[in-house]
Amino acid sequence: MAMTTIAILLAGPAYAANPFLDTPNDKPISAKFRGTEWSEDIGDKDIPLTARVVTTRVAKMPWGAIIKIEYTDLKSSAEKQREIRPDYFIVTDNRIVLLNEEDNDAAAKKISAMDKPPEFEPNDIYGITSGTFEHQEVLWKTTIKLKGELCIYEATHPSGHFRKIVWKKGVGLVENASGYGARADGYRLKREVTSQKR
């Protein structure tokens, strides 16, 4: 009995899955997203935009995981097709943190070899599992709130720049929106709801 207790204590804390962003394995999970985009080139009206969002766990550590979210098959009637860069998130049991490096692939490999999570910059926190979170960096104001099954990240700037990410428990990303200036350029994508047979 004493040996078992010692082994458990020496093992340290194990990663408990984050309810808002988790994958069962390393296989990509794909979902359809639908929304709108706008820009000065498009004109006054928003136009429909669709995308396939692929979520893949690229690393798993005893203390968390690194998950890549890619935006593929973006389609709209715009002359210039939109590109959305992939996002990498460091996921612990209580945080979702944007990996914001010049070379995210190299950074993901380095972080995945660490014994514990790195120190997180407050402006890179994109999800929480309890309470609320507020952060101000120069003119950018970030709030993260929990509302029922949702974790809502919103960052705004007085110039009109914004970013909104919505996570849903047991699902993952359900909304991604980003805009620059007073409607100079931006998009809003929401996950399509599919009926599930039980």
What are these regions (language model features)?
Residues 17-198:
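Conserved functional acidic sites
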Residues 2-11:
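Bacterial N-terminal signal peptides
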Residues 12-16:
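Sec/Tat signal peptide C-region and signal peptidase I cleavage site
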